[in-house]
């Protein structure tokens, strides 16, 4: 899907380890980060620019610093810190923008061991243009997000995933 966006001349900006995850495929710009704070600050910088496309961010501290290391206090503090940046991001959104927040897997900092955990992770979707709030049905994979983004940008979909665009109001 990132390649479809790029081929349609959209900006596809990766912040954090997005370039590593996707082997630099489909990105028009990539920025590495040191930590969550750096990632949030770089995201805010991009949001202040005039760009047309997708800004895809991975805040790795939730996983690497607090999840795998089983540090619930640090994890909680990281969520509180992110919440401050989220408020700033929300203020910069326009009526045309859609903000999606999700994790790629569970990593409960209170669970034994150091591996990923298997709980479901939320998908939060926000836009100033939405007129209603609600709860979406369970999303089964990132293919749902990919298909939804393809609909939002009117680009070719991949063969996987069902779009939930019609449920966003």
Task: Say what each PLM segment does.
Residues 1-169:
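Feature captures the catalytic ectodomains and active-site-proximal regions of enzymes
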């Amino acid at each position: 899907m990132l390649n479809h966006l790029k081929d349609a001349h959209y900006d596809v900006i990766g912040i954090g380890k997005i370039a590593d995850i996707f082997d630099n495929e489909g990105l028009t710009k990539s920025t590495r980060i040191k930590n969550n704070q750096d990632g949030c600050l770089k995201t805010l910088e991009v949001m202040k620019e005039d760009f047309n496309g997708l800004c895809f961010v991975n805040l790795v501290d939730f996983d690497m610093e607090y999840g795998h290391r089983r540090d619930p206090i640090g994890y909680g503090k990281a969520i509180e810190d992110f919440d401050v940046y989220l408020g700033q991001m929300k203020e910069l959104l326009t009526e045309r923008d859609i903000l999606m927040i999700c994790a790629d897997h569970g990593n409960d900092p209170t669970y034994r061991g150091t591996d990923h955990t298997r709980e479901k992770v939320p998908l939060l979707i926000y836009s100033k243009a939405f007129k209603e709030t609600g709860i979406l049905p369970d999303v089964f994979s990132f293919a749902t997000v990919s298909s939804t983004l393809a609909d939002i940008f009117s680009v070719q979909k991949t063969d996987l995933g069902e779009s939930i665009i019609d449920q966003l109001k």
